[in-house]
A protein has these predicted regions:
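Flexible glycine-/small-residue-enriched beta->alpha junction loops
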Residues: 163-195
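A short, polar/charged loop-to-alpha-helix boundary motif
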Residues: 98-105, 172, 262-270
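Intrinsically disordered, low-complexity, positively biased terminal segments
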Residues: 1-39, 50-53, 187-445
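Conserved acetyl-CoA-binding loop-helix of GNAT-fold acetyltransferases
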Residues: 114-117, 122-139, 279-291
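Conserved active-site alpha-helix within GNAT-family acetyltransferase domains
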Residues: 139-144, 150-169, 306-322
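Conserved acetyl-CoA binding element of GNAT-fold acetyltransferases
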Residues: 106-119, 265-277
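Conserved beta-strand in the GNAT
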Residues: 75, 83-97, 111, 116, ...
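Active-site rim helix/loop that mediates acceptor-substrate recognition in acyltransferases
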Residues: 49-101, 215-240
């Protein structure tokens, strides 16, 4: 049965995926009983990620949150199967959120999430079919860039995605006397996590505006930071702690959530959940609070930036240990002129870039001209004999990775990931794309 919001199974998909159909439908936000397609979709996603599958009120809560995000789902099914009665073999979600390209500068981005393929159907082209179809759809909608976070680092480059931001997992030794390099100001107030329902999103949006590389948050964070997941203690809370920083005038400027890991641990530890600061003073005050928690000897944080600000907050930077560093945000440019016109610049410059793109969206030779903080990108046709002479040749994955300025084009040249036709061109591109603030993605999706 084809519902009004379905995309009917298409014969071209069956040509690529024999015996399979592709369906597309929105996350309505309705309970599972009213939207069994989405209930089965979410169940498949959780199983394919080896997660616990929610049911009852917990499942309905997740469905409602995904509806608030405006997600559109794609599922690959056995031929002629009804998505309301069959589990999808492949899953994919896409939705639009703002990408911060500079301070107070945003572009709408196509966010990709919940991409899975059942283990029994690997290497049949299911992922490629879903990804290419949805990137085509994003282009048709006029979205200049796509974004995702990758469960595996070797999957998405083939589709033109490049790493644009990184994050660290850190441990802070708080035993003994810990001091900050500069005194904190304002005050810290402990609050019930549920008090963050309104305050949290407002502060996040203010921090977002100052953080190139971050994206608008998904609705699930309002539940995570208020400790109200129905799958855990029926939404009544599980011991999450929350603290809000107020400046000297009493205005909230930031907040942090954290959880004690238990007295059975050899070293008494708290794990930071979410830390949002809209000012440098707020960031300093929140860490002043965390490193001076009574009885605690270690603070763990799984979403630390690469900028080493945390180390510089402390008089003893060796108290901070990085236990893991990994890629966070992957970007994929879909419209070269729109993407580069949609970010700020700190200097003037001009470069000719020859871009290869296996999907064709960004392919071509482009002149990037920046004057007075504004970029204009024009196509020059094919490079090579008789055509435009590029300064650099690179794949769209590399172009997407360096786009925000958090990844160096010069380092990619040294790694052999791009080709320089004019000496110094990679360093020029690095300088031209330098960000106005450290590039970091504050959130997952």
């Amino acid at each position: 049965m084809t519902r009004p919001t379905d995309t009917p199974p298409s014969e071209p998909v069956r040509e690529v995926l024999p015996g399979l159909d592709l369906h597309r439908f929105p996350a309505t936000g309705h309970p599972a009983e009213q939207d069994p397609r989405m209930a089965r979709m979410l169940t498949a996603v959780e199983r394919n990620f080896y997660e616990e599958v929610p049911s009852g009120a917990a499942l309905d809560q997740v469905l409602e949150l995904h509806g608030r995000d405006g997600r559109t789902y794609v599922g690959v099914y056995e031929a002629d199967a009804d998505p309301a009665e069959a589990d999808p073999i492949g899953t994919y979600a896409g939705f639009t959120k703002p990408l911060q390209t500079g301070v107070n500068r945003q572009l709408d981005a196509f966010l990709i999430s919940e991409v899975t393929v059942r283990s029994t159907h690997r290497r049949r082209g299911i992922l490629r079919t879903m990804m290419e179809a949805e990137l085509d759809r994003a282009v048709a909608q006029g979205l200049p860039i796509a974004a995702l976070s990758a469960s595996e680092a070797t999957i998405y480059r083939r589709f033109g995605f490049g790493v644009a931001t990184h994050r660290r997992v850190v441990e802070v030794d708080t035993a003994g006397e810990v001091s900050l390099a500069a005194a904190s100001t304002g005050s810290i107030r402990m609050v019930d996590p549920k008090d963050l329902a309104d305050l949290g999103p407002a502060l996040y949006d203010r921090a977002l505006a100052q953080t190139p590389g971050s994206v608008g948050r998904v609705a699930a964070y309002t539940v995570t930071e208020t400790d109200s997941w129905r799958s855990k203690n029926e939404g009544k809370g599980t011991g999450l702690l929350a603290a809000v920083h107020h400046d000297d005038g009493g205005t909230p400027r930031g907040y942090v959530t954290y959880r004690f890991t238990g007295w059975d641990q050899k070293v008494p530890t708290v794990k930071v959940g979410v830390l949002v600061a809209t000012t440098a003073a707020s960031h300093r005050a929140l860490w002043d609070h965390l490193v001076h928690l009574d009885l605690i000897r270690r603070v763990e944080w799984g979403f630390a930036p690469e900028d080493r600000l945390l180390e510089n907050l402390l008089t003893d930077p060796r108290r901070v240990t990085t236990t893991r560093s990994e890629d966070q945000l992957w970007l994929r440019i879909l419209d070269v002129p729109a993407a580069f016109a949609g970010r700020p610049y700190q200097r003037d410059g001009e470069l000719v870039l020859a871009v290869t793109d296996p999907l064709g969206h960004a392919a071509g030779t482009w002149r990037l001209l920046v004057r007075d903080g504004t970029a204009a990108v024009v196509p020059l046709g094919e490079s090579g004999p008789g055509g435009a002479r590029p300064d650099l040749s690179l794949d769209v994955a590399e172009l997407s990775g360096v786009y925000l300025g958090g990844v160096s084009a010069e380092l990619l040249r040294q790694a052999g990931r791009l080709t320089e036709h004019r000496a110094g061109a990679a360093a020029e591109l690095t300088a031209l794309l330098a960000a106005d603030r450290p590039v970091f993605c504050m959130t997952g999706f």
